[in-house]
Amino acid sequence: QIHRNNAFYGFLIQVCRLIYESSALDESGNNYKFRDFTRDHQKLARLFESFVFNFYKREQSRFQVSSPRFPWPFKSEIDEHNSLLPAMLTDIVLEDENRIVIIDTKFYSNTLSKRSDFGTTSFKSPNLYQIFAYMQHIPNPSRKDVEGILLYPDVGNSINARYNWKDQNVTFKTIDLDQKWTAIKNELLMLVDLIHSEAA
C-alpha cells in the first residue's frame, strides 16, 4: 500500500505498470515486444500527473501534498438527485499554513487551441473552466490564499503566463522534460516559490 513514507514508489509502480501494459507477445509466443506507448496520450497524461505528484512529495517538505476530492456546492431537495452530481477530483494540491496551490496537469500534442476561422491561438477553455472551479470550491475554512496552476509538458511552445483575478493567481506553465534533471527540479520548485530564479 502506498502511503506518505513511500509515496515515491507510486511513480515507479506507474512506470512498471506502463511497461507491462505496453508489452505484448510476439508471433512466436515466446518473446515480448514493447509497443510504442508514446502514442497513447491517456497513459502519458497519467504518468506525467504521477511524476509531478510524487516530485512534490519527495523533493520538498513545506507543503502537504494530496489529491483531495470534494463535492459541488449545489443541493437538491431530492436526496437521490444529489448522488448524481460528480465529485471534483484534483490532480495535485499543495497546502501550507498560508497557501493552497492547485496544480492540474495536462498532456497534449498541442498545448494551445487554434481557431481556423481567425487563425488565432488560445489556451483550451475546458482547462481554464476546470481550474477555476477547483479554486472557487476547494474547502478553505482558514481563508488561505488560493492559486491555480495548469502544467503542461513543453511540446515546442514554451509558455509561462500568469493571470490575476480578485487576488487569485492562475498560471499556465510548460516544462521541458528533455532537459537535465537539475533544471527540471529547479523549475518545479520555482513554480511554487520554493526557490527563486537566482538559485536555479
Where are these regions (language model features)?
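Residue(s) in the substrate-gating loop at a strand-loop-helix junction
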Residues: Q1-R39
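Catalytic core segments in nucleotide and nucleic-acid processing enzymes
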Residues: H41-A200
